[in-house]
From Swiss-Prot:
This is Uncharacterized protein YwbG. It is a multi-pass membrane protein. Belongs to the YohK (E.coli)/YwbG (IPA-22R) (B.subtilis) family. It comes from Bacillus subtilis (strain 168). It is found in: Cell membrane. The gene is ywbG. GO terms for cellular component: plasma membrane. Disulfide bonds: none annotated. Signal peptide: none annotated. Keywords: Cell membrane, Membrane, Transmembrane, Transmembrane helix. NCBIfam families: CidB/LrgB family autolysis modulator. It comes from the Bacteria. InterPro entries: CidB/LrgB, YohK-like.
Length: 225
């Protein structure tokens, strides 16, 4: 139990430290999403603490991911008129983006001759962690592996997303939000809020819709592949 408590506080401290570093040196390789797990893995290996012992405390943070999504209700309420006005455009774009993410991931994985379990673990990588892990378990994947790919997708999305926005000169706040929320879930939403509160809110909606659509569409689409 003591190790679990230490693990919990250590995880929070490492994350806060990584966040401070990222604020001062905002680079891809200083992202807390990358630095925090790398430091924690290094520390666990150094002191020879098994993952099971760490997860007694660290796992509590994973359990908090689901209720944490409730916080997105605040901007949703604030910008409800905007959401209502562009509901059809948002839903259609997120639906297309989610299906493309599922199909392209599965096809590339099959082309690389990856095992079925790994393919099923990769497919839900584009949605927020709690739902991605649930979808992975539902279709026969490995939730822990899925969580890793979710983080990698978030990192790539927060780097490539703004580049796409700049290159194609996407000035529309709705389009920016849909792009980042659908492709990079929570991390993309955080980046969208840096652009504007409207983009962040649309990104929140897109992230939630993408999660629901992936939950429903992934088992169906994979049955044809």
């Amino acid at each position: 139990m003591f190790i679990g408590i230490v693990s919990l506080f250590l995880t929070v401290l490492v994350y806060l430290g990584a966040k401070k570093v990222y604020q001062r040196f905002p680079r891809v390789y200083t992202s807390p999403l990358l630095v925090t797990p790398a430091v924690l893995v290094g520390l666990l290996l150094l002191v020879n603490v098994p993952y099971e012992s760490y997860n007694l405390g660290g796992g509590l943070l994973t359990d908090m991911l689901q209720p944490a999504t409730v916080a997105f209700a605040i901007p949703l309420y604030k910008y409800f008129p905007v959401l209502k006005k562009y509901a059809v455009e948002i839903i259609l774009n997120v639906a297309v983006g989610s299906c493309i993410a599922i199909i392209s991931t599965a096809l590339i994985a099959k082309w690389l001759h990856l095992g079925t379990g790994l393919i099923d673990s990769l497919v839900p990588r584009s949605v927020t962690t709690p739902i991605a892990m649930n979808v992975s378990e539902m279709i026969g994947g490995m939730p822990a592996v899925t969580a890793v790919f979710v983080i990698l997708t978030a990192l790539l999305g927060t780097v490539i997303g703004p580049m796409v926005i700049r290159y194609f000169r996407i000035d529309n706040e709705i389009a920016r939000g849909v792009l980042l929320g659908t492709s990079a879930h929570g991390a993309g939403t955080s980046k969208a809020f840096e652009l504007s509160s409207v983009s962040g809110t649309i990104s929140s909606v897109s992230m939630i819709l993408a999660a629901i659509m992936t939950l429903c569409a992934a088992p169906f689409l994979l049955s044809f592949m």
